[in-house]
Amino acid sequence: MKKLFGTDGVRGVANVYPMTTEMAMQIGRAAAHIFRNGKSRHRIVIGKDTRLSGYMIENALVAGICSMGVDVLQVGPLPTPGIANITSSMRADAGVVISASHNPFQDNGIKFFCRDGFKLPDEMELRIEELIFSGDMDSMRPIANEVGKAYRIDDAAGRFVVFLKSTFPKDMDLSGLKIVLDCANGAAYKVAPAVFEELGAEVIAIGVKPNGTNINAGCGSLHPEVISAAVKEHGADLGIALDGDADRVIFVDEFGNEVNGDNIMAICATDMLQKGTLNKQTLVATVMSNMGLDIAVKRAGGRVIKTAVGDRYVVEEMQKGGYNLGGEQSGHMIFLDHNTTGDGILSALQVLAVMQRQGKRLSELAEVMFALPQVLVNVRVAEKRDVMTIPAVAGLIGDIEAKVKDEGRILIRYSGTEPLLRIMLEGQDKYQISGWAKEIADLVEKNIGGSKVG
């Protein structure tokens, strides 16, 4: 059982355990020791988003890593997939991302990439934790002339821009397209506008003035209403919203209607099926994806495999099965032919390429999938008990499942990063499933304590 690492690294409120400078230094020390194999000089890339606490945590990590004889390459604010890409392209031993993704600025996190750009497997996270809590690290310190050095890589953002543009078809450009782009005042505030503008689009950029405390604040992928209003105001062709570390993306079409991760997976999967480029005719999604996605892909001659929630589990399944497209309803999209992790900007480029190639507007492309009505209720809880051990809750869920049968489904799971129980229902009648979701939430509140969120 891991004590620090969750589904997406170590995460919490900045300056509160475990996101303290003391723990960040220990994480840096332990990771550096584990990645330090052989006698050659070793290097770890560190990047971050735009949170105020990023400076504090970065300095602690740098100190910890250097104290164990490993050099640090600091790339500054850069999207999470950019850090994965730079780690691999610079042949570093590992990459570290300081970010809490879509969470508010008060939170922060630390997650690692291996030298190949893929996220750290569970067993390596466990090794880092074991070393931290073993108390053995003081005896592992190198002597003074063997400590590491820290360097700044000033052209990291430019390198990533060049890489992203290389994933767009060379015989196409974006001239004639007007795009509203929301960078969430986060890590992509410089990179994303540059990519789309250099490919010829007219870009109306918002969320590009980070101040340390406004990341994800009323903007970004969790607030599609912002780009929806801007698309209507400017008569744009579409809107693109990234989150704080730009590993996910949400769209709105020319009418301001949201096009979520399921829609995007359906668009890309069916296009790749038509071209014969979808490996094994298979898309990898999570259990949160709408049943309408399964129907759309099956109709096009493919299939959908479902994993647990979390882009790391999607990537693991893709690697294991040799698949090249996967993603989540939340907007994480993984194109393994191009990158090793969820990449909002790269995903947007692939969708734009489909639009240009097929000569269709986004609203037309989105018609490939019709989503079943879906309701999601979050309940904030004090403890993460197995709700199926509560007779009243288990009984109610069983009754609802019997009524839904094959025309819908119930999914109940705890968030991997927050103290939330997520209750999701799909079915033919939205009003009916909304009532059922509320019934389950009320029973959970009564038996575990807590309150509904959103």
From Swiss-Prot:
Cofactor comment text: Binds 1 Mg(2+) ion per subunit.
Q: Name one GO molecular function term.
A: phosphoglucosamine mutase activity
**Keyword list, A-Z:** Isomerase, Magnesium, Metal-binding, Phosphoprotein
Question: What InterPro entries has UniProt attached to this entry?
Answer: A-D-PHexomutase_a/b/a-I (IPR005844), A-D-PHexomutase_a/b/a-I/II/III (IPR016055), A-D-PHexomutase_a/b/a-II (IPR005845), A-D-PHexomutase_a/b/a-III (IPR005846), A-D-PHexomutase_C (IPR005843), A-D-PHexomutase_C_sf (IPR036900), A-D-PHexomutase_CS (IPR016066), Alpha-D-phosphohexomutase_SF (IPR005841)
Instruction: State the Gene Ontology BP annotations.
Output: carbohydrate metabolic process; peptidoglycan biosynthetic process; UDP-N-acetylglucosamine biosynthetic process
What family, per the record? Belongs to the phosphohexose mutase family.
Question: What protein name does the entry list?
Answer: Phosphoglucosamine mutase
What organism does the UniProt record list as the source? Geotalea daltonii (strain DSM 22248 / JCM 15807 / FRC-32)
